[in-house]
Amino acid sequence: EMQRSLVGSEMCIRDRLFVVSFTILLVGCDNDLGHQSPDDEWTAETLVSQADVERSGVDAWFRSETISDQIFSRMWLKSWKEDCPLKRSELRYLKVLHRNADGNPQRGEMVVNAAIADKVIDVFRRLYQADYRIERMVLIDNYDADDESSMRANNSSSFNFRFMTGSTTKISKHGLGLAIDINTLYNPYVKQKDDESWHIEPATGEPYAFDRENKTNIPYKIDHNDLAYRLFTEAGFEWGGDWTSLKDYQHFEIDL
């Protein structure tokens, strides 16, 4: 009888220890994700708990800042080339939240022209509040400013200095920070070449390049019913999906 009592006591103690340990583990996990502030060092693709978003207020997580030395060092000789005529002061580093593929709040970053920074911040805030999904939003410098690599990763980005195809003087809209690409893998650039073959960027976006009107299984599809289309065009942007000589479904650009 005494032995059964001792065994029962040991089991009870083990159960209590398990509950305490499990509780500590849960709290620890929550601390790994939670208790973040928008004032912390900003690392894109980091998850943020809904509680922390609410604690600071949504607006605090959407900011436009000048290009710091740290950010510029990431851009140097990648998105920022030596022949770039823009001044650093003409660009802004955006900190935003977006809903990732799983619908969870995630830190994002983007460099845009200073003249449109507030406008873009407002669009991304409204997209976030509407639970709009953007899988990834990091500087294209994470991909050595290689468009194809960035697009294959379904990365959303803006500034990447370059001249327009065939020109050594005319800067592209991305080169001015006046164009934004959203969910790039599933909204590719599509142009028919002279030999009637197709040029598609990214190349892995070919399954999403044609007959888009009749396809209902394209993730992140941008069309005239899409919220990103509505918000960007309301803000004065032009959508590449409306072009006739080619289609650039990921692309929104604006004139100053």
Please place each PLM-identified region on the residue numbering.
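Bacterial signal peptide processing site
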Residues: D30-D32
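Active-site acidic/histidine clusters and adjacent loop/turn architecture
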Residues: L86-M151
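Single conserved hydrophobic/aromatic residue that forms the stacking wall/gate
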Residues: E1-D15
